[in-house]
Design a protein with these regions (language model features):
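Conserved strand-helix element at the start of the C-terminal RecA-like helicase core
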Residues: 1, 156-181
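Conserved segment of the helicase C-terminal RecA-like domain
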Residues: 217, 250, 254-290
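Inter-Walker segment of RecA-like/P-loop motor cores
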Residues: 4-46
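Post-DEXD/H (motif II) to motif III coupling segment of the RecA-like Helicase ATP-binding lobe
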Residues: 52-63, 70-125
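Conserved helicase motor
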Residues: 10-22, 39, 168-171, 190-207, ...
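Interdomain hinge/linker at the junction between the two RecA-like core domains of SF2 helicases
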Residues: 100-158
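Conserved two-lobed SF2 helicase motor
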Residues: 28-48, 212-228, 240
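A short beta-strand element within the Helicase C-terminal
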Residues: 222-250, 264-269
Length: 291
């Protein structure tokens, strides 16, 4: 997509095979437009190998856009923001953080984070673009989220024709998928999308889901967080296992995405699991704050 707009563009990430000429250019980022990953970018700033640091002079005086900025690791937030500030103050860079769920970096002590909003009244914009209604499965008496087993969730999902469930663990995704497989007659309508699949296979699955949605064919998807950002799919109903608020919002972005109805439906539930139900301690702490 970018190459149709910019005449000179260099794509540099671990899964991209480069020609000898492009490999030499990528070592120094000698191009007017660079498409890379946040990992590769920060490696160029923090690496202890000279080969990784040869890009710094070309980073200076640049406009740097971080898409889906909320995905930057929270445990490295202090170092990340300090590096960003240094590039702005010492190297005359301009940073743009693009996301629907902007982290509160100002809360980090000593972060020196003073961004300028590009949109003057972002709250009003969010109100105008509201597309979903969120159902929090709460017990009004004690404000605890009902803990749902996957068989019950599968039974509800099987009654829908265009629905997705996003869970926190691959183990949960497999369990829900197998529960649905016993209920859904059309096996071609059922999809599992996790990082157990290689990137090429995930892309193939996404393309098939898009094809079925375009033809208004039944589509029931079980996925992990790999579907939350940058995946252009549109579901009428979306179930989201309890997670940090930004993850719930990102998942909700896959519901009623194209405004085919007034409001889509997002259901937040807590899985019934006696074992560890979250991918990491910081993720679990953030989910408990939401709860």
């Amino acid at each position: 997509e970018y190459s149709r707009i910019f005449p000179e563009i260099l794509v540099d990430h671990s899964q991209k095979k480069l020609s000898e000429e492009k490999r030499e250019l990528s070592a120094r980022w000698s191009a007017s437009v660079i498409i890379t990953t946040s990992v590769r970018f920060f490696e160029s700033l923090f690496a202890d190998k000279p080969t990784d640091c040869r890009k710094l002079h070309n980073i200076a005086n640049s406009v740097i856009l971080f898409d889906e900025a909320q995905s930057l690791p929270s445990d490295l937030a202090t170092a990340t923001i300090q590096a960003v500030n240094t590039l702005c103050e010492k190297y005359r860079c301009t940073m743009v953080f693009s996301t629907a769920t902007q982290p509160d970096y100002q809360a980090i002590e000593g972060a020196r984070w003073h961004p300028t909003e590009i949109i003057s009244d972002s709250k009003s914009l969010f109100e105008k673009t509201k597309r979903v209604q969120i159902e929090w499965r709460l017990n009004i008496n004690d404000l605890h989220i009902y803990r749902s087993d996957f068989c019950a969730i599968a039974s509800e999902m099987a009654r829908e024709s265009n629905i997705c469930a996003v869970v926190n663990l691959r183990r949960h995704a497999r369990e829900l998928f197998h529960a649905l497989a016993n209920l859904v007659r059309d096996s071609g309508a059922l999809f599992l999308l996790t990082t157990d699949l290689c990137p090429a296979h995930r892309l193939e699955v996404v393309r098939e889901i898009k094809r079925r949605q375009r033809l208004h064919e039944p589509c029931i998807v079980v996925a992990t967080q790999c579907i939350e950002a940058g995946v252009d799919l549109d579901f009428d109903v979306l179930y989201r296992a309890l997670a940090p608020l930004e993850a719930i919002i990102q998942a909700a972005g896959r519901c009623n995405r194209n405004r085919r109805q007034t409001f889509g439906k997002v259901v937040v539930f807590e899985p019934l699991d006696e074992r560890r139900a979250y991918p990491g301690d910081s993720y679990e702490r953030a989910a408990m704050i939401v709860k």
